Structure formats: C-alpha cells, structure tokens
Amino acid sequence: MTPHVMKRDGCKVPFKSERIKEAILRAAKAAGVDDADYCATVAEVVSSQMNARSQVDINEIQTAVENQLMSGPYKQLARAYIEYRHDRDIQREKRGRLNQEIRGLVEQTNSALLNENANKDSKVIPTQRDLLAGIVAKHYARQHLLPRDVVQAHERGDIHYHDLDYSPFFPMFNCMLIDLKGMLTQGFKMGNAEIEPPKSISTATAVTAQIIAQVASHIYGGTTINRIDEVLAPFVTESYNKHRKTADEWQIPDAEGYARSRTEKECYDAFQSLEYEVNTLHTANGQTPFVTFGFGLGTSWESRLIQASILRNRIAGLGKNRKTAVFPKLVFAIRDGLNHKFGDPNYDIKQLALECASKRMYPDILNYDQVVKVTGSFKTPMGCRSFLGVWENENGEQIHDGRNNLGVISLNLPRIALEAKGDETAFWKLLDERLALARKALMTRIARLEGVKARVAPILYMEGACGVRLKADDDVSEIFKNGRASISLGYIGIHETINALFGGEHLYDSEQLRAKGIAIVERLRQAVDQWKDETGYGFSLYSTPSENLCDRFCRLDTAEFGVVPGVTDKGYYTNSFHLDVEKKVNPYDKIDFEAPYPPLANGGFICYGEYPNIQHNLKALEDVWDYSYQHVPYYGTNTPIDECYECGFTGEFECTSKGFTCPKCGNHDAARVSVTRRVCGYLGSPDARPFNAGKQEEVKRRVKHLGNGQIG
C-alpha cells in the first residue's frame, strides 16, 4: 500500500520515492559528491521506512533522510542536504501567507487588512499590534485548531468564520449586555482598585467608562448597556441629595430649585464626560470601544434627566467643530402610552430624539411592542443588531443583563445559488450541506470555551459583568448553556441569491420572488431551531451586518464564477435581507418589504431608511418612525450630516470610489471635513478610516427612499 504524504498546507498526496532521490542528488551536486548509486540507496532505505506506514508528513521524511546521510560516508553531503532543507524552509516561509500578511501590514500595502474594520485606525501603533496579533491568531487557528473542512470552506468563501483574528485562538466571545446595575450596586475589583458603589452620577459615569474599556478589551464584539437611564437613575438621586444637603446647610433660598439645577448640570456634564471618554479610549483590541447605550423607558425625573442629557450631548457634538460622535451608538426605546404619541408623559423626550436623529443620525429606535413580539421580551441589541431570546433564572425571573453571544458563522447564499445554476432543487440540497458545515463550525466556538477558567477574564466572570461572581478556577462554560447565551448562524445576499436563481425581474417587484426570499430565511430558521432543540444551546438566526463580508464573498465568487450580472457585477453583496440599495422606493414601502424578515431572523436584525436633510421637517421623520412602530422592531435613520470646515457646507458630500468630496468647494482633506455614514448597524467616519472597496461601492450606490420627492 502506497502511503500518503501530509503536506504543509494540509493536502494529502501519494508518496513518491523519486522526490527523495531528486532532493539528495541536488544536495550531492552542491557538496561535490559524485555517487549516484549511494544517493539511490539512501532514497530506497528511507522509502522502505515510509512504506510501512499509511501516512507520513514532510518533516518526518526529511528527518529520516538526514539521519541516513549522517550515518553514511559523506558528511559534507549530509551538511549540504541540511543546509538545502534550511534554505528551502526560509524561502517557503517568505512565500507563505503568514509572512506575506505580516509584510503587508508592516509596509501598509495590504488594503484588505488595513480597511477591514472601519472602527480601526490601521495607521497607529496600538492598532497595528492588534492586527499583527490577529494575523498570527488566524494562521494558528487555521493550521492547528479548526477542522480541515471548516478551514477550507472559509477559505473558499462557502462560509465565513467571523472574527478569526480573535477566536478560537483565544477563548473569547462576541458581544454582550453588561450587568452594570449589579456591578455598581454590589461593587467590584478592577486592576488594583476596589470599586465601591458610587455616590453621585458623575462618579457613576466615570466608573461606567472604565467598565466599558475593560469589558471591550476582553471580548471582540459590541458592548451594550441595556436601559442605562434606569440603571443610573439612583445615582442622580444621590447627587440631588448631596446638592439639597448643601442648600440646606447654607440656607440657600429655594433649596429645591437649587438642588435640581445643580443636579441637572452635573448630569449633563457627567454624560458629556462619558461621551468624550468613550470616543478617546483605545481598548486592547486597538479600537474605540464599540459600545451601545439603550434608553428611553425610564419615567422618573432622574431617568428623564439622563435621557435628555444623552441626547443633548450628542446634538452638541464633539470638540470645537462639534463633530458627530460615532460612539456610543444610541438606541432609543419607544412605547405606546409612554413616549409614542402627543400627550404621552415622555413625548417631549421623543421630540428631542427626533432632533438628534436628524442632526446626528443616532438614535436608532426600538419599537417596544414589536421587540417583545419578535424576540419574546424587551431588550437592547448587543452591539449593533444581535438580540437575545428569553431566558429565566432558577427563580423564574427573566434575565437579560450579563448575557452574551458566543459568535457567528455566516453562509454565502449567493455562492450556493451560483453553484446550483438556476436549479432550485439543487439549491436546497446544497443549502442543507452548507448548513451542516456551518453547524460544525459553530460547535467549535462552543468547544473552545469548555474548560476555560474564570481567571482568564476577571471583569467578565469574577467581577459581575456577565452577571456572575465565579471563583478563579471555576469553569465558565456553564453560564453559556440552556439558552443563557446565544450563538448565531448568519447569512448574506438574499437579493443576489434570488437574482442568481431566477434572474430577470427585481425581487421587490415580484410577490413570487419575495416569497422565495422569505422561504430561504425560513429554512435557515428551521435549522437553528433544530440545533437548539438537539444541543440545548441558544442557536439563533442573525442577519449579518457584512461590513467586510459584502466585499470578501463577492470578490471570491467573482474569481470563481466570473462577473455575473445582478450577482457579482457590483463588487459587493447586499446585507442579509435588505432591499437592494439602488432600488428607489418610499420609506414606508421599504419597511413593508423588509418587515417579514425580523420575526424569522430574530437573533439579529435592523431596518433603516435613507433620507435627505430633514432637520427642518421633523414631523416627516416622526411620521416614518410612527409607521415603523406598527411594522418592525428596530429602525434606523440615515441622513446627510457631513460638514466642510473650509467653506461651512453642511449636507451630503459626493461619494466616489476614491473617497468623499465637498460639493461646494471640492475639499477632500480628511483633517478639514467631517463625513459620517452608517457602515452597517453603526456609524463610521470614512474620511478618516476608509471602507473596504465593496462597502465603499455599496455606500456610493445608496439612493434616498422617497415617494414622489416627499416624506409623509
């Protein structure tokens, strides 16, 4: 039986003794040894050793040759062979992917790596250190940790193993809802400091900033504080009581008015400091913390004050140029009877949120009733769009804070459609095969966290961020079981998938094609529900944001299938279930088109609309928000808020394949402009940190969602 040789790239090839003989002869020539018979004898001896086995690797063969030569009469030949092997190893290493990727980072020539994440400034040293660590982590995971078929599927573009630069090399998870309430009320240890419960709102927000930085350095996805207005309200009360005590001690007239005024100022300043802190922090991951604040449901004076402070600070902007803050992402909850309609007690806060959205794009909105209907309970998304399902503790209480998502594997749906060549039956068969592979990949994420001790991330597991206080040697995997954590199957390109399968008519214009798109997502949902039942883990379906993936999948498919009209010809794939960005429809019809998908993909979703400048037409924006309240759980507003510091222009810069330019004066100096775009579920500043080529092309093609030039 001929043994197989395991090559360095993982491929298996038949063993050939001729290859050994050729290598020895080359070394003999270099050493000045003219003895072909001896070389052939060495090759035969080594071959006989290898033939006794079913599988060998390259290193074993080379070591056997070296040993044989060292025991022979030609020591210079042995030395020449060893040197030859060493030189080949060096040349191979230089040509290898790891070396090439490191060189691309050092020389700043690998644009795909440098622009992969719009939140990472690849020009600065901390980010470059993170990117370097990511290159090594990816390489090690591909070579030593992940199953070969999973790696090959990722490399081909059948699936995408998200955040391979962090996991599974490190036992990290994706995104989470921090249990801020538990940490602030019970106290915790961070570094060398014992943190006691704060005694004022200013201290509470300062501690919150440190918690965000620590947590964001221990996970690779988004960090969310759920219902922050209600969580921090007691610390506003603490501040009020301090100011009231001061007024009484100094016998200040109108002590009540004084205390409220001082508290309002302190609260505003506290959230201003928090916003600046978040936008100036750099985590160990080489980026600004990707943090989300959920708020809007609090009814107390203190909660309302926090809501107003968050919004007014965002409206004010950052620095002397009043630049739009990218983080925190703001998510404002709307609930009928609270702040939805005129006459509701918090309706004035909604008006402030509308003003803020028109000027700063955030907040996005969570429609309370729809969120409960789709996900089973109300909560803020983790990161930009990942939603937890319902989970109850041993006391039957619904728990959200302290829970997390373990990671995502996304399917390349357009590729399956291209492989099916218009055959719908073949598509469904291939889809089932890819689903089995995706499940295998997702299970590696779970397996990586088994046996991990709490001491690897004290802030998460020992100090309360995950809602638990484990001991250093406790196994963390228990808190991820029985649906407490989610783990998600993602997908991309429903629009291109339908085009590849059926061609012709636009998906939006055909009820039959719409049904086909929904059927695909229904099949994905059936799969994750089945996996959840079979494993007990919280598998969910997630509508992948696709910042980098929209470019990567399309690029790989173009190389494999060529430029296919309606599929690969644009240079990007459409995010998840979203309407084609070039399709001009009014915002209400876009909401109607996308509304069937969140109930199916309830592990992650967002809907949004593109608008002109609506700062002077807030009633029109409110009309769309109100329409969304009845139809979708989570809605975002994209409006032109670019600014030119040369000529004073505010509005929308011209987007080209190369960047952004002021339409009034032609300025495109990144230091003299502010350009803000929604990357996927969050905002980015592409003037300072460019998008990848696919995302830039997608942004360039976006049209405004207007009906006959009007909203409302």
Swiss-Prot record:
Top-rank taxon, per record: Bacteria
Residue span, Glycine radical domain: 583-708
Keywords, comma-separated and alphabetical: ATP-binding, Metal-binding, Nucleotide-binding, Organic radical, Oxidoreductase, Zinc
UniProt note on regulation of activity: Activated under anaerobic conditions by NrdG, a tightly associated activase. Activation involves the formation of a glycyl radical at Gly-681.
Cross-referenced Pfam families: ATP-cone, NRDD
The keyword Metal-binding is annotated on this UniProt entry: yes
A single GO cellular-component term on record: anaerobic ribonucleoside-triphosphate reductase complex
Annotated GO MF terms: ATP binding; metal ion binding; ribonucleoside-triphosphate reductase (thioredoxin) activity
Annotated InterPro entries: ATP-cone_dom (IPR005144), Form_AcTrfase_GR_CS (IPR019777), Gly_radical (IPR001150), NrdD (IPR012833)
Catalytic activity, reaction form: a ribonucleoside 5'-triphosphate + formate + H(+) = a 2'-deoxyribonucleoside 5'-triphosphate + CO2 + H2O
Enzyme class: oxidoreductase
GO BP terms, alphabetized: 2'-deoxyribonucleotide biosynthetic process; DNA replication
Record field: transmembrane: none
List of residues binding Zn(2+): C644, C647, C662, C665
Keyword field contains Zinc: yes
Every ATP-cone domain range: 3-92
UniProt feature coiled coil, ranges: none
Subunit structure: Forms a tetramer composed of two NrdD and two NrdG subunits.
Role according to the record: Catalyzes the conversion of ribonucleotides into deoxyribonucleotides, which are required for DNA synthesis and repair.
Family of this protein: Belongs to the anaerobic ribonucleoside-triphosphate reductase family.
Entry protein name: Anaerobic ribonucleoside-triphosphate reductase
Species classification: Bacteria, Pseudomonadati, Pseudomonadota, Gammaproteobacteria, Enterobacterales
